[in-house]
Amino acid sequence: MVMTDPVADFLTRIRNGNMVMHETVEVPGSRIKLSIARIMQEEGYIKDYEFVEDGKQGIIRIYLKYGPDKKKVITGIKRISKPGLRVYVKKDEIPRVLGGLGTAVISTSKGLMTDKNARKQGLGGEVICYIW
């Protein structure tokens, strides 16, 4: 079966692994998924990630992060721009997730970045997902 939205699958695997308190989650590799994982690590949503070669497309291993008393760091992840309905924003229309407490991942001409970085650089683009 062909996967129509690999990014949504990536986000769903992280969401599901987080809900059942897994330490790690493995997903098929791609450049966009690596960029999203890098942003999630920089913003403090995951502990770490690594790319593992498997002879095909590779695997991204994500180490999920939990706070004291096993409190979840990732409360929610939502896919915004989908293959059937792309969502684009101009530089002055970049959304704030939970009033600035969450993060929007935006695909710009300079690569994937957070909503804060896109606002700072004056770039618009495709809204990939929200993380809070």
Curated annotation (Swiss-Prot):
Keyword rRNA-binding assigned: yes
InterPro entries: Ribosomal_uS8, Ribosomal_uS8_CS, Ribosomal_uS8_sf
Keyword Phosphoprotein assigned: no
Gene Ontology molecular-function annotations: rRNA binding; structural constituent of ribosome
Record GO cellular component, one term: ribosome
Subunit structure: Part of the 30S ribosomal subunit. Contacts proteins S5 and S12.
Protein name, as recorded: Small ribosomal subunit protein uS8
Gene for this chain: rpsH
